[in-house]
Amino acid sequence: MKKVKIALTKGRLEEKAIEIFKDIGVNVDELLNKGRKLIFHSENKEYNIEFFLVKAPDVTTYVDYGAADIGIVGKDTLMEKEKDFYEVMDLKIGKCKFAVATLPEIDIYKGYNIKKIATKYPKVARKYFRNKGIDVELIKIEGSVELAPIVGLADAIVDIVETGSTLKENGLVVVEDICNISARMIVNKTSMKTKQNEISKIIENVNRVVNN
């Protein structure tokens, strides 16, 4: 049985992804008691898996270069970073949406002046406003993008919205939803050939659990 290496996104998706693997019979004891470890081994008669936890943007890099065979990552990351791999499944966890938000008194769709948009996702934002025929200046923000309209850095933001509570607390409103997003399973193209039996088994079993 060939070892399958799986890169999991740290944080928001981690716990729910581990639950899915537990439900298909993977031993997740090391993942549940991880301490400061970076790599976690899981082997039984059904699976031989090596997990590692990385930040979301790095999951695609690990899979793209073949350091990981499978990755679990949000669709938001996939939309922002185009790589060469298979996107095989919607895991239906980590559900949220991309949205445009601003202060209630600002109408970003009126007037001909170039609007300033703050976002962690410039590629997603650029495509959205281009399709609307609106000229924008994109400002890349790594921290709390909600701050940008409040302090006058930007007219609006494009960001992930889960419940909307953070926006409300900061006096912002959603003016339009862009698209729904959730966690996806991605697979390295070469690994799909060289470890076809092992990876196909994981995909089939996860699909059964997710769509049950």
Curated annotation (Swiss-Prot):
- Any Gene Ontology biological process: L-histidine biosynthetic process
Q: Which CDD domains match?
A: PBP2_HisGs
- What reaction(s) does this enzyme catalyze? 1-(5-phospho-beta-D-ribosyl)-ATP + diphosphate = 5-phospho-alpha-D-ribose 1-diphosphate + ATP
Q: What is its EC number?
A: 2.4.2.17
- PROSITE patterns this protein is in? ATP_P_PHORIBOSYLTR
The biological pathway it contributes to is: Amino-acid biosynthesis; L-histidine biosynthesis; L-histidine from 5-phospho-alpha-D-ribose 1-diphosphate: step 1/9
Q: Is-annotated flag, keyword Repeat?
A: no
* UniProt-annotated location(s): Cytoplasm
One short Pfam name that applies is: HisG
Supply the InterPro entries for this chain.
Answer: ATP_PRibTrfase_cat, ATP_PRibTrfase_CS, ATP_PRibTrfase_HisG, ATP_PRibTrfase_HisG_short
In terms of HAMAP family, this protein maps to: HisG_Short
Q: Which family does it belong to?
A: Belongs to the ATP phosphoribosyltransferase family. Short subfamily.
Per UniProt, subunit arrangement is: Heteromultimer composed of HisG and HisZ subunits.
Q: What does this protein do?
A: Catalyzes the condensation of ATP and 5-phosphoribose 1-diphosphate to form N'-(5'-phosphoribosyl)-ATP (PR-ATP). Has a crucial role in the pathway because the rate of histidine biosynthesis seems to be controlled primarily by regulation of HisG enzymatic activity.
Name of the protein? ATP phosphoribosyltransferase
Q: Which organism is it from?
A: Clostridium novyi (strain NT)
